[in-house]
Amino acid sequence: MSTQFDQVSVIKKANIYFDGKCVSHSVLFADGTKKTIGVIFPSTLKFNTGAAEIMELNAGKCRIRLAGATDWETYEGGQQFNVPANSSFDIETIDTLDYVCHFV
């Protein structure tokens, strides 16, 4: 994945979830696609998805459990994980997570 996004629009207003434990900004591309870039501070949270997502981790460490799974999987900076559409996942952030969420 690239280290920067060129020729994009960034929504100035932050998306703040879970009392500030997750903060992101929306990035809009000329082709109509959208991504969010943000951080998740150490916590355990549950996210619901509409569109399928690819979570690209730039830095930090977390454990995730997809809907219906019993086991947790560990991910860290330089890795990514996929979340199906209309689903959910639990995330335990061990070290502050710097991420890009790609909506697919």
From Swiss-Prot:
Q: Which GO terms describe its molecular function?
A: guanosine phosphorylase activity; purine-nucleoside phosphorylase activity; thymidine phosphorylase activity; uridine phosphorylase activity
Annotated membrane-spanning segments are none
Tell me yes or no: is Zinc-finger among this UniProt entry's keywords. Answer: no
Give the enzyme's EC designation.
Answer: 2.4.2.1, 2.4.2.2
Q: What class of enzyme is it?
A: transferase
| InterPro entries on file | Ppnp, RmlC-like_jellyroll, RmlC_Cupin_sf
- This protein's record includes keyword Iron: no
User: To which protein family does this belong?
Assistant: Belongs to the nucleoside phosphorylase PpnP family.
Function recorded in the entry: Catalyzes the phosphorolysis of diverse nucleosides, yielding D-ribose 1-phosphate and the respective free bases. Can use uridine, adenosine, guanosine, cytidine, thymidine, inosine and xanthosine as substrates. Also catalyzes the reverse reactions.
UniProt name for this protein: Pyrimidine/purine nucleoside phosphorylase
Classification of source organism: Bacteria, Pseudomonadati, Pseudomonadota, Betaproteobacteria, Burkholderiales
